[in-house]
Design a protein with these regions (language model features):
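Mature extracytoplasmic or organellar-lumen-exposed domains after removal of signal/transit peptides
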Residues: 18-164
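Low-complexity, Pro/Ser/Thr- and charge-rich linker/hinge segments at domain boundaries
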Residues: 1-21
Length: 164
C-alpha cells in the first residue's frame, strides 16, 4: 500500500481544479448551443406569421442554422434518442470523462497517462469551443440580426365574420 502525502494531495487538487476550468468552459459553450436552439424554436413561431415570400427564405436559413446546431451538439455528445448503450469515443463528453477517471484513479501525483488524457481532453475542448464561438459570432449572429430586423407580426389580420 502506498502512502499518500501532502504533496500528492496538493498535486491532485491543482490538476483537478485546472481540469474543472475546462469542464466549466465546455458546459458554458454547450449551454450557448442549447439557448440558440430555444431561440430558433421561438423564431420558427414568429416566422409562421410572416408573408409567404419572406417565410420561404427564412425557413431555408433556419434549416441551415438548425443543421449547424445539431452538428456542433454532436461534437459534445451523441444525439438524443439513440437506443441501447452507446459508447462513442469521439465525443468531447467521453474525452472529458476519460480524463476525469484518470485524474481520480490514483492517490498519488497524476502520472503520464492521466496527464495525456487531460491534455487530449483540453485540446478537444478548445477545438470544439472555438467551433461553437465561430458559429455563434458569425452565422448565428447574422441570422439573429435578420430575425431582429423583422417587422414582427404576432397577430394575423382578422376581419369580422358575417353570414351573407
Amino acid at each position: 500500500r502506498s502512502k499518500i502525502t501532502d504533496v500528492d494531495r496538493k498535486a491532485i487538487n491543482e490538476e483537478s481544479e485546472e481540469f474543472y476550468k475546462v469542464i466549466t468552459a465546455t458546459k458554458e459553450s454547450f449551454d450557448q448551443l442549447k439557448d440558440a436552439k430555444k431561440s430558433l424554436d421561438l423564431s420558427r413561431k414568429i416566422i409562421e406569421m410572416q408573408e409567404d415570400t419572406l417565410q420561404k427564405d427564412l425557413k431555408k436559413q433556419m434549416k441551415e442554422i438548425s443543421s449547424s446546431l445539431d452538428s456542433l451538439s454532436n461534437l459534445f455528445m451523441d444525439p438524443e434518442g439513440l437506443k441501447g448503450i452507446q459508447r462513442n469515443p469521439n465525443t468531447l463528453n467521453n474525452r472529458l470523462w476519460t480524463a476525469r477517471r484518470y485524474l481520480g484513479s490514483s492517490w498519488t501525483i497524476p502520472g503520464q497517462n492521466a496527464m495525456k488524457a487531460v491534455t487530449n481532453a483540453r485540446e478537444e475542448a478548445e477545438e470544439t469551443i472555438k467551433a461553437v464561438n465561430e458559429f455563434i459570432q458569425v452565422d448565428y449572429l447574422l441570422f439573429q440580426e435578420t430575425i431582429n430586423g423583422l417587422r414582427v407580426k404576432i397577430f394575423k389580420e382578422m376581419q369580422p365574420v358575417k353570414i351573407e
